């Protein structure tokens, strides 16, 4: 699963733009608004909201911002966000799934189609690549000052399915139903959560070697991630580390 880590995506984006922090606030804010609309403003009785608040704090979103978003949603904000997942192929046949929260599906579809067309891909119909992915909980933890073998045992004991360690971090994979419980168990054990999400993990991957296709793929991912309507981008590129900076 190396190369498909959400943490890798976030790190690449943070290195490329000073506006990444504001983008993160916007995206998590939309998720919180939808959670309040669907389940109410009290995290004690709205587990989805509670998970998002914890996630926002891990992403360094100030508590004042979080409370402001909740109050705005509770006060009857008329903006209606709709969750839509778009699917397509990037250059070289790389499968791409794009999760969005949008208040204008026509605008979002047009934007995404433009990004794909401009960068050697094509936006497809619903279901055209979803069968190539499995939903998993993906949790990236810091291994700084931690023993990798001990961390693996802690993750597996918490209910993880897989553990993939690198030099200073590890990617923990879980069943979607166990995802929140594993995050909480690892936090309780003192691990720093670098990122966590319900991810669409590719069952097979595509390796790009053509420099032009790698450049196009990098531009496609950047364009998608920079769009405020886009919440998550999942893809089957095997060698993401080869994308140009």
Task: Explain the meaning of each model-derived region.
Residues 1-124, 128-138, 235:
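N-terminal cationic and glycine-rich segments that engage phosphates or anionic surfaces
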């Amino acid at each position: 699963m190396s190369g498909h880590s959400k943490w890798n995506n976030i790190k690449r984006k943070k290195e490329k733009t000073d506006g990444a922090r504001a983008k993160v606030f916007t995206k998590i804010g939309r998720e919180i608004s939808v959670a309040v609309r669907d389940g109410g403003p009290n995290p004690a009785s709205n587990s989805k909201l509670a998970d998002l608040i914890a996630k926002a704090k891990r992403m360094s979103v100030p508590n004042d911002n979080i409370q402001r978003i909740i109050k705005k949603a509770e006060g009857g904000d008329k903006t209606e966000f709709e969750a839509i997942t778009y699917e397509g192929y990037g250059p070289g046949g790389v499968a791409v799934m794009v999760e969005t929260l949008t208040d204008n599906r026509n605008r979002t579809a047009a934007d995404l189609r433009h990004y794909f067309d401009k960068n050697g891909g094509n936006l497809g119909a619903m279901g055209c690549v979803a069968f190539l992915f499995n939903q998993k909980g993906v949790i990236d933890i810091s291994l700084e000052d931690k023993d990798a073998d001990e961390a693996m045992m802690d993750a597996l004991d918490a209910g993880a399915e897989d553990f993939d360690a690198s030099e200073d971090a590890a990617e923990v994979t879980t069943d979607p139903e166990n995802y929140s419980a594993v995050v909480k168990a690892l936090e309780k054990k003192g691990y720093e959560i670098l990122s966590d999400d319900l991810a669409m993990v590719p069952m097979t991957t595509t390796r790009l070697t053509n420099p032009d296709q790698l450049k196009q793929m990098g531009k496609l991912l950047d364009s998608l991630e920079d769009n405020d309507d886009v919440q998550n981008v999942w893809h089957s590129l095997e060698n993401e580390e080869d994308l140009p900076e």
